[in-house]
Amino acid sequence: MRPPPKSWPPTKGSEPLPNAPRIAPPVSAAPPAGKLHGARALSGPLPWLLPALIMLGLFYLYPIAEALRLAFTDARLFDQTTEPSLDSIRRVSQSAALPVILQNTLVYTVASVLGQLGLGMAIAILVVRAERARLRGTMALRTLVLAAWVIPAIANGVIWQLLFSEAPFGAINSALRMVGFAPVAWLSDPSNAMLSAVIATIWQGTAYSMILLYAALKSIDPALNEAAAIDNATGFERFWFITLPHLRAALLVNAILILIMTLNMFDTILSLTGGGPGRATEVLSLFAYNTVFQSFELGRGAVLSILLLIISLTLTAAMVVFLPRERK
């Protein structure tokens, strides 16, 4: 069989032969619209985001939805039978202890957040200046501060309970006796118990603030401070007009994060004072914990958890407004 000519169909001059067969050019079949849309979806960011979305829904959104459901029931911890009811919400709203607990939460949170921000900034500035001056011991200082952050909150409460102990072996009262001062009822006096809880929380949380602010301080150009020093600016003026404006975003982000952590913290207070004496150190998160695991009232505990969530979201939204925006 002879192969077809190079020009197909056969032509005579520039015109094709009248009876020559015509071969249609190959046509590529287009995929269906549904398959094309699916392929585009699979090649986009959705497959990469799907595991994170599943984990977010499983460990965050589902517990919130379940807490909302339990808040409208009379559920108890070891009782399988639950009925829809508004009794849990009514009992929480009419609780005589709730105003005291909200006041304790406000005092504890504000004092702890301000203390962690202030002390964390002071240590971060000290470390940065010591590094620029090439002083020894900066690594040891950072390690010492970070060691407090590594300790679990329960252990942190136990440590400070021993330090604040009013027994003869209490370290702080022993030091006060040595210098001629009278011992202080750190944990048994309601006016001192909250201060003790705040000190223990600040001691542990300062490292977190120090890390964030240390990174922000390292990003400030040293030439700005050098130029201000040449212009005879004082140390306070350099801090107020150069350092603080550059730390605004880091300070607000740090404040938001430690605000949320402090609002949800109860384990340090649980091991330090147990919420006492009386209700002097009982905060909202500890009240919710005691309601569920001591009173076994799951419905009331869910209401308190939702209340804590609302407070956290409201305060966070109020602080996010002050975050600096990029100018377009």
Pin down the residues of each PLM region.
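Transmembrane alpha-helical segments of polytopic membrane transport and secretion proteins
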Residues: 1-49, 132-139, 320-328
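A structural signal for multi-pass alpha-helical bundles of membrane permease subunits
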Residues: 44-328
